[in-house]
């Protein structure tokens, strides 16, 4: 669903619709707006009233409907509005999917640290398949990735997954709220995690690093497509099949997911997150150095390090939250993690990135992004206090 448009939408907006960098950034900031409250609200509903697997299907149905509406729009305001509404119902599905997967592993009495990453790999495989499809498929002689057809493809997949979601193992809900406080009833207990200094610092840096998550999604394809206007790169295979090149990032992600259990047990969450932050520095830096000609190797290296940059933060962070929280607030806690990363982080990061691109252009913008990631890494190393206990990560079987 996401792979059909997340990587290629920026190039369509900038090239096909001639939107500015700030406008392009605003579309990716919709994920931030939605994540500020929708994952937490849906997490509360999943914990208290509607089983997570059913709520997952409902969200995909509604999100797909708004994607269909968005595909027919070309003006900024209506297109932005439809995408915002679609994303509002899509973003909660990430945390809900995690909860449904953890529940299935729990029912099977399997170790989440060991068995969740291999399951999560298939989400990345689907993402890659969708990217290749929109890059290689032409309608009217034009690649889908350069047109609104990418949104129709995503909508179709949303409807398919909605139907499938209803067949997944049932998740429990707690409807017995008579003896609970209103905080428990609303699922707000997860926000009490901010009272714990270590968790508060973890969530704050999740927000700071979350600002980097959507930058290459928004502008990676746009940047590579810009090389097509230069005579020496006009016929470059990298420019023509930029989305396939970018899919190397997801291939790297597929491999790196499998490394998470080892790295978490060996090094702990702090070092794993530091590795992720430094990988983001390289991700942006290599983009700035690279080009479709003599600098092609740097573009490829940027794709290779993406797996470490994304997985070592996103997946490991989710598992860390899973380990640190109780069953009663687990879905809500995953929602809070989403708020900080894909909420505040993505919102401010996407708008800031769009402003930087409009002001500084290419390739200087990449160096600014790399510098930001480096500063966050250095501060995190000194501020986040965590003593790794390998036994804690040896088994997470709730």
Task: Please describe what each predicted stretch is.
Residues 63-66, 76-96, 207-208, 297-312:
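Hydrophobic core of transmembrane alpha-helices in multi-pass small-molecule transporters
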Residues 1-32, 198-234, 241, 245, ...:
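Helix-loop boundary and gating motifs at the non-cytosolic
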Residues 168-204, 229-234, 398:
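Juxtamembrane intracellular "pre-TM" segments in multi-pass secondary transporters
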Residues 26-44, 244-259:
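Central cavity-lining transmembrane alpha-helices of secondary-active solute carriers
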Residues 136-156, 355-373:
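A membrane-interface helix-boundary motif in multi-pass transporters
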Residues 37-51, 138-139, 255-269, 357-358:
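Helix-to-loop junctions at the C-terminal end of transmembrane segments
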Residues 61-75, 278-292:
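C-terminal ends and interior cores of transmembrane alpha-helices
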Residues 84-122:
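Cytoplasmic helix-loop-helix junction between adjacent transmembrane helices
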């Amino acid at each position: 669903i996401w792979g059909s448009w997340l990587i290629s939408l920026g190039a369509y907006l900038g090239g096909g619709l001639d939107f500015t960098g700030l406008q392009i950034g605003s579309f990716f900031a919709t994920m931030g707006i939605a994540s500020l409250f929708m994952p937490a609200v849906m997490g509360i509903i999943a914990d208290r009233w509607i089983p997570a697997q059913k709520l997952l299907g409902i969200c995909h149905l509604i999100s797909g409907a708004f994607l269909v509406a968005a595909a027919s729009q070309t003006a900024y305001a209506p297109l932005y509005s439809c995408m915002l509404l679609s994303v509002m119902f899509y973003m909660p599905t990430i945390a809900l999917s995690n909860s449904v997967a953890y529940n299935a592993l729990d029912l099977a009495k399997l170790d989440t640290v060991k068995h969740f990453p291999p399951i999560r790999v298939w989400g990345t495989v689907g993402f890659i398949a969708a990217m290749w499809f929109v890059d290689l498929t032409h309608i009217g002689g034009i690649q889908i990735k350069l047109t609104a057809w990418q949104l129709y493809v995503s909508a179709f997949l949303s409807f398919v997954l909605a139907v499938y979601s209803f067949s997944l193992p049932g998740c429990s809900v707690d409807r017995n709220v008579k003896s609970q406080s209103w905080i428990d009833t609303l699922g707000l207990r997860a926000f009490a995690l901010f009272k714990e200094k270590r968790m508060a610092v973890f969530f704050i840096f999740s927000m700071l690093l979350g600002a980097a998550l959507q930058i290459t999604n928004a502008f990676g394809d746009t940047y590579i497509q810009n090389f097509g206007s230069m005579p020496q790169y006009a016929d470059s295979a990298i420019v023509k099949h930029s989305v396939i090149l970018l899919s190397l990032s997801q291939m790297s992600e597929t491999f790196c997911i499998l490394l998470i259990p080892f790295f978490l047990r060996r090094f702990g969450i702090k070092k794993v997150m530091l590795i992720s932050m430094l990988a983001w520095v390289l991700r942006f830096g290599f983009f700035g150095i690279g080009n479709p000609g003599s600098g092609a190797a740097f573009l490829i290296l940027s794709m290779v390090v993406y797996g470490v940059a994304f997985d070592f933060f996103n997946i490991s962070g989710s598992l860390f939250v899973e380990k640190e929280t109780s069953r009663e607030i687990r879905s809500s806690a995953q929602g809070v993690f989403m708020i900080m990363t894909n909420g505040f982080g993505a919102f401010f990061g996407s708008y800031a990135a769009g402003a930087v691109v409009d002001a500084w252009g290419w390739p200087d913008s990449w160096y600014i992004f790399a510098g930001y990631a480096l500063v966050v890494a250095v501060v995190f190393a000194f501020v986040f206090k965590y003593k790794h206990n390998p036994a804690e990560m040896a088994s997470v079987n709730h």
